């Protein structure tokens, strides 16, 4: 295979992705191998690729590709989420641009438009993932609203309802006035907001000269007040017992109630109770049997209970009522106040706590197994620091509001009979059967039943994802589930740890009796170089497709992963992608160098080459072992850095230089074969991180058959290394580096040969390497170094290079004097520590021994430096 002079990512990437698809390299079917399973966190069907997707899916692809190369039957299931709120908002917006409202169309026609939108946009992000190199089994692509997933969702709803875990009731919910739907607590984002604290006068009924002051941040809700609450232990308000007060502007008398829920230190210690518009007030209202007055329409406009403010927007009312209260003498004062306000995650408008009839799922009984699994490490979170967050959520779990006032989504399978009673069934036909049994009336037909108009929360389908992607959740004989479930690793963001991860764990134990996955890898947030979260509004989020066009997919993957420690935020800068592209070029050029060497079958292997081959073989095995350890701990960023340094430093900068034949000379066949073998192993280690360039070069490395691919090659096994040999070689590299530094410092060109003088303690095993890499005439053993030579220390051993007229004696004396002063100061600090009786008495023996070694090493260096200085000064 011909190799181009320059790496062209665009050409290489399209070629090999098509090749992988053509030969079905990503496809997984159950067989005798151990499975490795990952399900993609399904992106919104309306979405396009952003940097968070890039990070998440790069990590998944690395894990999946490495598992394939470890011999597992790797199955990565892709798919998309129907995203009820987001998709419905997009479709409503498109229709509005045409002057059409959702209500004008009706449900069925609106859903046709929604499906058209989904088919038009649903495949975009999946195609973009292919550009990244995602090795998903695309034959398994799932959609949370496709037929199979929908059947499972409806069956699970019916099952949970029949178990008594799903119920319908009136509760205060988080209401989105823009999307016109209820939200779960997890769909509300709290933001610090600059607001005001209003101190209002509530006059005592029939006592016009007496009033109490009530502090509130929401004066627009006073029309819904049905009580004022004080703490029974608050002496200030004992006189109010049994009395009633008048709600300002409304004129309605409401009772004073007492409850220890009230914080005596907040505001004035008097709390206005508005049961229909605050979850805590609702609980007080239930406890004290208060009336609930809902003053808002669904869109945030005040209804007929709003009195003179009916028909006005809630925030306009806040401004108007403030002035009206001031004018009426009912406002004591107004203070600036920073408050945490709940916003809809999807529409970014302040939510409205609102009394509403909704469907709920009881969570407490489901949560126990899910909590125990994580706390007992049956399911491991990486990093483990998120266990405390998880525990806090699960120990304070609330019932899940699962109904949404939307048309796009799984319609709730509840049917209302003419008498108002309910039946829940998988289909309308089954609902009729149930209704007939329930009522004893065989004359009931489907026309007599009315299906609930609400849809299920999107997460109600997503929580079944690790099960439903393999077929019917309720099928106990599901062979695919038996093989692939539980899945191996889940890669996701910490912000949906409860939203999604915890709920999947609950569903796993409820419907399979098993955990849904073994490990959860929690990524960080991708931020810019200034630490800001990437967002469209800030304009600091690069287009991933443009990045890949500029730097190549492998370059961008590498740039992201180099800065992505598990659980910590990623500070991404475009220069990281440039670094990734440069590494691709380094690999490419190293390959071209190696393939450009000629072989001589009969040539004898030089000693330096034999040592280099032995060293790099051991070093490679050492890295393989480290990689296994890092992957087991999900430290992928460190794993990539390790392989990067192995290739760039150890292989390219050292090994290739050590074995490189003289200009115009061939290489012996033994060294060449070893070098090609090393390159093959390096490409395999790099492949999970950089799939495209490694596939291209692996095919160029040797003749391959159609359908062969590096991704199905096994990773090379690690063998035992000789650590003494590696340590000795590290000292050899230090000697070579010191020689090079002297050449640079003295401006001695590399082509000019030097002589190295060493003492008798020097290990001559690697002299052939030192002579070649340092371009030396010889290495001489001497009792005393040549006068006027330049010396250096490796550990406690001194080496010298006779420089003759090349050396500046005064400059060398100054350099050695500075080093001597540093070593003497260092020795003094060690001596002081060892002379401290308290330190010696308390420090572990190993620490004391380390300090004693520092002392002896420093003393040896000082003696050597003094000797070198004396010799130099004698030449002056």
UniProtKB/Swiss-Prot annotation:
InterPro entries: aa-tRNA-synth_I_CS, aa-tRNA-synth_Ia, Anticodon_Ia_Val, M/V/L/I-tRNA-synth_anticd-bd, Rossmann-like_a/b/a_fold, tRNA-bd_arm, tRNAsynth_Ia_anticodon-bd, Val-tRNA_synth_C_sf. Keywords: Aminoacyl-tRNA synthetase, ATP-binding, Coiled coil, Cytoplasm, Ligase, Nucleotide-binding, Protein biosynthesis. Gene3D superfamilies: 2.170.220.10, HUPs, Isoleucyl-tRNA Synthetase, Domain 1, Valyl-tRNA synthetase, C-terminal domain, Valyl/Leucyl/Isoleucyl-tRNA synthetase, editing domain. It holds the Pfam family Anticodon_1. One of its GO terms (biological process) is valyl-tRNA aminoacylation. It is found in: Cytoplasm. GO terms for molecular function: aminoacyl-tRNA deacylase activity; ATP binding; valine-tRNA ligase activity. Its main location: cytoplasm. Residues 804-876 form a coiled coil. ATP binds at residue 536. The keyword Transferase does not apply. It catalyses: tRNA(Val) + L-valine + ATP = L-valyl-tRNA(Val) + AMP + diphosphate. Catalyzes the attachment of valine to tRNA(Val). As ValRS can inadvertently accommodate and process structurally similar amino acids such as threonine, to avoid such errors, it has a 'posttransfer' editing activity that hydrolyzes mischarged Thr-tRNA(Val) in a tRNA-dependent manner. HAMAP family: Val_tRNA_synth_type1. ValRS has two distinct active sites: one for aminoacylation and one for editing. The misactivated threonine is translocated from the active site to the editing site. The C-terminal coiled-coil domain is crucial for aminoacylation activity. NCBIfam families: PRK05729.1, valS. This is Valine--tRNA ligase. It comes from Porphyromonas gingivalis (strain ATCC 33277 / DSM 20709 / CIP 103683 / JCM 12257 / NCTC 11834 / 2561).
